[in-house]
């Protein structure tokens, strides 16, 4: 039987799958481990000046770690999904702009590290690269953990929102310790005010609701079961922020990162063939 030629998009998606599959351990473990070392060395001013918190190296590393998630979701991006993801990008910029200008909903804070080009001199242009994967990774992990319970909206959405907030409970203390940003009023949770997490409940609820409507959940779950690397970006999250939190003694945040690692282990996502 003659082989059927894939359309250009299909060929690109298959090629991206192959690149990620062949380099899973490097992308999901080596990159975040090196990233953690580089960030900690930058925080201690141990690197040559231009390399300390180099924004373009940082963005390159983050983009590489996002590849498994991008490759995993790409075949599911219909026109409806694209509109939803575009809306989420706009929402990310909007709520961050409001937050910086008013201190609501996260609390008053300022960036302390160059995160690349800024929009209006205030909001990082790469913000969706940081925000959206938190929501998508939480959504995917919860689909696996909940199983058939994920069919119930009243269960699925609150659990995913809780997972997103839990991820920020692991991330924000590490980011503050590194000096990525600082809250004017501080906070007893490793320098982070609880108002930040109240804000995250709000922003996560909106983002999860949009994502839930944008993606076909049945097709997403089917792809998730077939695509072994689809949650590797969450593996990177556990490695990177777990290491940083341990270094600074943020033990609760480190344990939360480890909890997500446990979720990955329970769902059989720590498998890196050919490493």
Task: Please annotate each region the language model reported.
Residues 2-275:
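Aromatic-rich, lipid-facing transmembrane alpha helices and their immediate juxtamembrane interface loops
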């Amino acid at each position: 039987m003659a082989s059927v030629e894939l359309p250009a998009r299909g060929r690109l998606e298959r090629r991206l799958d192959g690149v990620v599959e062949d380099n899973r351990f490097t992308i999901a473990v080596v990159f975040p481990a090196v990233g953690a070392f580089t960030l900690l060395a930058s925080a201690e001013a141990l690197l040559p000046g231009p390399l300390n918190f180099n924004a373009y190296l940082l963005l390159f590393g983050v983009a590489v770690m996002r590849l498994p998630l991008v490759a995993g979701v790409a075949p599911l991006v219909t026109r409806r999904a694209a509109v939803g993801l575009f809306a989420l990008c706009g929402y990310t910029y909007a709520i961050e702009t409001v937050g910086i200008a008013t201190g609501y909903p996260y609390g008053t804070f300022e960036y302390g590290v160059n995160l690349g080009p800024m929009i209006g001199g205030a909001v990082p242009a790469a913000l969706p690269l940081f925000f959206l994967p938190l929501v998508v990774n939480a959504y995917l992990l919860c689909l696996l953990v909940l199983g058939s319970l994920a069919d119930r909206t009243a269960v699925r959405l609150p659990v995913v929102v809780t997972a997103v907030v839990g991820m920020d409970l692991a991330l924000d203390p590490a980011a503050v310790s590194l000096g990525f940003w600082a809250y004017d009023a501080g906070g007893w949770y490793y320098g982070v005010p609880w108002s930040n997490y109240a804000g995250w409940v709000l922003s996560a609820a909106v983002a999860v609701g949009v994502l839930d409507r944008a993606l076909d959940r049945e097709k997403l779950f089917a792809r998730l079961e077939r695509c072994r690397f689809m949650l590797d970006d969450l593996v990177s999250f556990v490695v990177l922020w777990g290491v940083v939190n341990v270094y600074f003694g943020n033990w609760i945040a480190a344990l939360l990162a480890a909890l997500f690692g446990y979720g990955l282990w329970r769902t059989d996502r720590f498998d890196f063939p050919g490493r």
